[in-house]
Amino acid sequence: MSDNIRTLQGRVLSNKMDKSITVAIERKVKHPLYGKYLKRTTKIHAHDEQNQCNAGDVVTIRECRPLSKTKSWTLVEVVSKA
């Protein structure tokens, strides 16, 4: 196993699945020609064992082994409630 496990922070978009959440990860990318910084969003499915998250919460997630076809991240903590 590697020592540096990837962790990300994002906003919960959906919690309608059982024990799963959809998290939006925002990053800023510089336009190659004009230099303007643009927001880019990535949606990630994460495992929420206790179903404790609601839409709008800010959460920390970490990478883990594949849990399903689309889930390979798990919830670490809820940073702030919506």
UniProtKB/Swiss-Prot annotation:
Indicate yes or no for the key word Glycosyltransferase.
Answer: no
Picking any one GO biological process from the record gives: translation
Instruction: Provide this UniProt record's keywords sorted from A to Z.
Output: Ribonucleoprotein, Ribosomal protein, RNA-binding, rRNA-binding
**Any GO molecular function:** rRNA binding
May I have one GO cellular component term?
cytosolic small ribosomal subunit
Keyword Ubl conjugation assigned: no
Task: Quote the function comment for this protein.
Answer: One of the primary rRNA binding proteins, it binds specifically to the 5'-end of 16S ribosomal RNA.
* Subunit structure of this chain's protein: Part of the 30S ribosomal subunit.
Which PANTHER family does the UniProt record give?
40S RIBOSOMAL PROTEIN S11 FAMILY MEMBER, SMALL RIBOSOMAL SUBUNIT PROTEIN US17M
Q: What is the protein's name according to its record?
A: Small ribosomal subunit protein uS17
